Amino acid sequence: MTETNQIFRCNVCGNIVEVLNPGAGQLVCCNQPMELLVARRTDVGPEKHVPVVEETGTGIRVKVGEVPHPMEENHHIQWIEVIAGDMVYRKDLNPGDNPEAEFPVEMASDFMVRIYCNIHGLWY
């Protein structure tokens, strides 16, 4: 059984999917079950992976890590996502970009931030 906003990855081709509508079936890609990614806060380099949230005049700014995460071709943050109530905001990033993004979410509201590193996976 899948749940809304879960993230799955294909360990063969690298496809990543986010569940929009939960269902009873198993997600399969390349003839293999997809791996459920579990966001973490500790492990390899938390100082470069844990999102840091700051208030701005129009919402929040999310920076990836207390120490800015590398944004190189072979190691970078692919996206930053904020889930606030029934809204999902996502900023796709590319090598060379700054590992940060701004979102129109009030700091006082209830929200969740997560990021995806192409090497070290999902973080919150």
UniProtKB/Swiss-Prot annotation:
The record's Gene Ontology biological-process terms are: removal of superoxide radicals
Q: Name one Pfam family in it.
A: Desulfoferrodox
One MF annotation (Gene Ontology) recorded for this entry:
oxidoreductase activity
Q: Where does Fe cation 1 bind?
A: C10, C13, C29, C30
Keywords assigned: Electron transport, Iron, Metal-binding, Transport
Q: What cofactor is this protein dependent on?
A: Fe(3+); Cu(2+)
Extract the CDD domains matched here: DSRD, SORL_Dfx_classI
Cofactor binding note of this UniProt entry: Binds 1 Fe(3+) ion per subunit. The iron ion 1 is coordinated via 4 cysteine residues.
Which residues does the record give as Fe cation 2 binding sites?
H49, H69, H75, C117, H120
Identify the NCBIfam families for this entry.
desulf_FeS4, dfx_rbo, neela_ferrous
UniProt cross-references to PANTHER family, sorted A to Z: SUPEROXIDE REDUCTASE-RELATED (PTHR36541:SF1)
What family does this belong to? Belongs to the desulfoferrodoxin family.
This protein is called Desulfoferrodoxin homolog
